[in-house]
């Protein structure tokens, strides 16, 4: 849709939140992008929801330098406006008499027995005519292509691969989010180059193509 709008297929984007109440489900970078765009379109109010608790302002003791710390950050979009609400979950979408979205029902949550549970007595409505889902990536779609190839999946639902990006099916390789899981485009680019090297070696018996990273490589974290 964004590409078609930029190419001039629409005089005005079909999605316009001017004068509307916007709720964004997800507290990450994608949610911040949604917030910034909504601000520029002139939304009446913008609320960004995050199920996790608000991070600390200080680096946690268990995340020493040079690991990337999980701390409270304010992006350029957040500096411009909007409200961030932490430790909440969306329980219900409410519609008006015309069937259009009018509000979300949210509750505070607490972590119990390995999962987030709503806190009794904390349900409330927040107005919303637009809701954007920015909740992250739960794995590749297990639809026709994956089922037709017959590739195996790992415990997280991603396509399983070995150290050369090869799946259990001869001649089928996987790179990027489909094999790694949710990540950044720089990882997908590096994996794509490495997978191309592996495919070249598979077809030609050897390769001179660079392979920047192994499929098991991970960011420096604890």
Name every feature range the model reports, one short phrase each.
Residues 17-28:
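Beta1/beta-strand and adjacent pyrophosphate-binding region of the FAD-binding site
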Residues 31-36, 41, 175-209:
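A conserved FAD-binding loop/helix module that cradles the flavin
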Residues 10-13, 76-83, 87-129:
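A structured beta-alpha segment of the ubiquitous adenosine-cofactor-binding alpha/beta core
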Residues 1-19, 112-182:
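FAD-site-proximal beta/loop scaffold in flavoenzymes
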Residues 9, 35-92, 207-222:
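Rossmann-like dinucleotide-binding cores of NAD(P)H-dependent redox enzymes
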Residues 27, 50-54, 95, 177:
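Cofactor-binding loop segments of dinucleotide-utilizing enzymes, especially the Rossmann-like FAD-
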């Amino acid at each position: 849709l964004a590409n078609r709008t930029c190419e001039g297929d629409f005089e005005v984007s079909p999605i316009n939140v001017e004068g509307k109440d916007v709720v964004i489900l997800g507290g990450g970078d994608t949610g911040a992008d949604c917030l910034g765009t909504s601000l520029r379109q002139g939304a009446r109010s913008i609320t960004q929801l995050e199920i996790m608790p608000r991070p600390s302002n200080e680096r946690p003791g268990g995340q020493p330098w040079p690991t990337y710390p999980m701390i409270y950050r304010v992006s350029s979009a957040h500096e411009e406006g909007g409200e961030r609400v932490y430790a909440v979950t969306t329980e219900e979408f409410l519609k008006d008499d015309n069937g259009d979205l009018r509000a979300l029902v949210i509750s505070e949550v607490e972590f119990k027995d390995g999962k987030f549970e709503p806190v009794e007595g904390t349900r409330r409505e927040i107005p919303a005519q637009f809701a954007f889902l920015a909740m992250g990536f739960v794995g590749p779609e297990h639809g026709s292509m994956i089922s037709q190839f017959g590739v195996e999946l790992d415990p997280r639902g991603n396509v399983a691969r070995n150290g050369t990006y090869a799946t259990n099916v001869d001649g089928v390789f996987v790179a990027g989010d489909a094999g790694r899981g949710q990540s950044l485009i720089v990882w997908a680019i590096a994996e794509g180059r490495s997978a191309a090297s592996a495919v070249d070696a598979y077809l030609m018996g050897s390769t001179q193509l660079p392979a920047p990273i192994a499929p098991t490589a991970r960011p420096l974290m604890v």
